[in-house]
């Protein structure tokens, strides 16, 4: 909601950290690019939820769409997403529209407004618990996504270290 914190899931502090960490994150972006290169959505329209500045979004994947509607609550997200990806996408003729909106809260309406679009949740579902702070409600809302998105091409990516863990380590070959 404000420029510094953006509701605890973004803001100026986050974007400065993300910008400074680009090199360190590049192997993850490369793995995501390899995975997404195999994904073949049946549409040219993408609803990108939680886009932030697109720090984790491979440009080659974004370029596969003719239209992208990017949603984020962070007041800096649209400007920084355009800074990172806008020129490249414009050159390719991709129509990019940024929306400052809580897409999770209005997802059924957005799906009706964009009936042919596929949906990608970019580092947003794992943060839902920090915004809502009621674990039972979060679990209920995330479980409802299966019904809400039924019949729709959709996917999600999120880092593992966004919240408390049970202390187990990840398998090295994940």
Residue ranges and their predicted role:
Residues 42-54, 153-174:
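Conserved class I S-adenosyl-L-methionine
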Residues 74:
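Conserved SAM/SAH-binding beta-strand->alpha-helix loop
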Residues 52-65:
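Conserved SAM-binding loop of SAM-dependent methyltransferases across substrates and taxa
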Residues 116-135:
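A short SAM/SAH-binding and catalytic strip from SAM-dependent methyltransferases
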Residues 112-114, 133-154:
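A short glycine-rich, Lys/Arg-flanked "PGG" loop and its adjoining helix->strand segment in the class I
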Residues 1-43:
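Class I SAM-dependent methyltransferase Rossmann-like catalytic core
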Residues 84-113:
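S-adenosyl-L-methionine
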């Amino acid at each position: 909601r404000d420029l510094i914190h953006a509701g605890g899931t973004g803001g100026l502090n986050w974007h400065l950290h993300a910008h400074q960490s680009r090199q360190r994150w590049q192997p993850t972006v490369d793995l995501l690019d390899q995975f997404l290169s195999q994904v073949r959505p049946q549409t040219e329209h993408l609803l990108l939820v939680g886009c932030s500045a697109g720090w984790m979004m491979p440009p080659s994947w974004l370029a596969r769409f003719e239209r992208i509607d990017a949603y984020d609550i962070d007041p800096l997200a649209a400007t920084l997403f355009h800074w990172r990806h806008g020129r490249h996408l414009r050159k390719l003729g991709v129509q990019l529209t940024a929306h400052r909106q809580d897409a999770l809260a209005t997802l059924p309406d957005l799906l009706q407004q964009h009936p042919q679009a596929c949906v990608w949740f970019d580092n947003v579902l794992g943060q839902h618990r920090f915004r809502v702070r009621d674990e039972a409600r979060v679990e209920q809302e995330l479980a409802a996504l299966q019904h809400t998105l039924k019949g729709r091409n959709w996917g999600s990516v999120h880092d593992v270290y966004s919240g408390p863990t049970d202390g187990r380590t990840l398998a090295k070959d994940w």
